[in-house]
Amino acid sequence: MLIRRLAWLGTSAVLAVSAAGAASAGSPTAAVGTPPASAAADSQLSVRHVAYKQWADGDALRRGTLAGTRVRRGAVRIFDPIGVHSYRGRRYGFGRWTSPWVRPGFGLTEAVPSWRAATPAGTWISVEMRGRTPRGLLSSWDSLGNWAEHDTKFRRTTLGAQVDDLTRVSVDTLQTQGRSRLHAWQLRVTLYRRAGSTVSPRLRGVGSMVSALPDGGDAATSRPGSARGIVLDVPRYSQMVHRGEYPEYNNGGQAWCSPTSTTMVLAYWNRLPDPSEYTWVRDGYRDPEVAHAARYAFDYGFDGAGNWAFNTAYAGRYGTSSFVTRLRSVREAERFIKAGIPLVASISFGAGELDNSPIRGTNGHLLVIRGFTERGKVVVNDPAAESAKGVRRVYRRDQFADAWIGGSGGVVYVVRPGSTPLPRRTSEPNW
């Protein structure tokens, strides 16, 4: 299993461990993807298995189980709360949406959910996930985040490791314990509103990437494909010009690679927040939209702005269909570039392992894949450059594959307007 890399040029975060409750019974009913792999193949993990499943419109959301909620105008909304929950001194009525069970066709070891929602003041959502083994054992419902767009009277947060015999949580990622494999998974989203209020959050889409990857070793280097010579015009932003700024959001600089990269792809699509949304940023501040992204993607439990799902949820506020997944190769990234879609990619590498990088090494960093040279080298916007002028970089294809596929397992944020079609899906769909 891959180790989750949490911060570049720093130490990994240590998360508090809490006991997880027992799960209720249930049985998988939905099947997608390839036929189930054998137990032997799963244990060897010799193949890069990645699958993505989402419910992204009203018809799809109606396939879930509704409790105190209804689907109206393409979104799940609270209709008649099924209970009242006290959270940090306030009382909230709540309803739920629960996905069908999904069989990806292999024994998964990691999962990262994503969602798109609107949360008016006084509302928020909680996203949970559980899995089932071939023997029928259920993991607990583990929280992957309490989330809201706003932060004046609510703090979006992850809740720690939540360890049980089958799973644990590392920030935004559900991971199996030891040699456990989950052959089916399920999502649950709880919608909250202030008790007595009629204002509801709106869940417009939710899904998850699940994967089972080989252990260790360098990534195979693919030959250049059909995106050779295509470089997308992605605006350049440096995270380092924010060094030492806004200590309440982890001091900018090296901690802001993710919101800076998210800002770059939003700028590419001309979907940045309106200036009226960042009037709280002081006058004369350079790139205030980056500070806005850092604030509204900030995870107060993790104490950082690098939560993958919180970044795509932030991007979803601005008319984009955004999610986290893994790609299996640089060739798959080329398919997105050919379709006109830049990617935010998570990488890690040691000193001297990525020529032309603005940093010596990192145990977790995000940048934007924006294209390829005629010879297949990877053209990126790397926000770790000292200024916007140095953000555009060209990396060797083999070294980048090792840093990206070998580092995070190929994690990307896919951010695009819903009207922009995705590339044709693979036989084991991972987008």
Regions found by a protein language model. Name each.
Residues 42, 48, 137-161:
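Trp- and S/T/G-rich repeat-edge/linker motifs of beta-rich repeat architectures
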Residues 8, 49-90, 101-106, 122, ...:
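Noncatalytic regulatory segments and standalone regulatory/sensor domains
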Residues 90-92, 99, 280-431:
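Conserved active-site-adjacent core of cysteine acyl-enzyme catalytic domains
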Residues 106-119, 349:
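A short beta-strand element within beta-rich, extracytoplasmic domains
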Residues 15, 33-60:
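Intrinsically disordered, low-structural-confidence terminal and linker regions
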Residues 158-182, 335:
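Short, surface-exposed tryptophan/glycine-enriched loops
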Residues 190-304, 430-431:
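Active-site-adjacent structural segments surrounding the nucleophilic cysteine of cysteine proteases
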Residues 1-37:
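Secretory targeting and sorting signals
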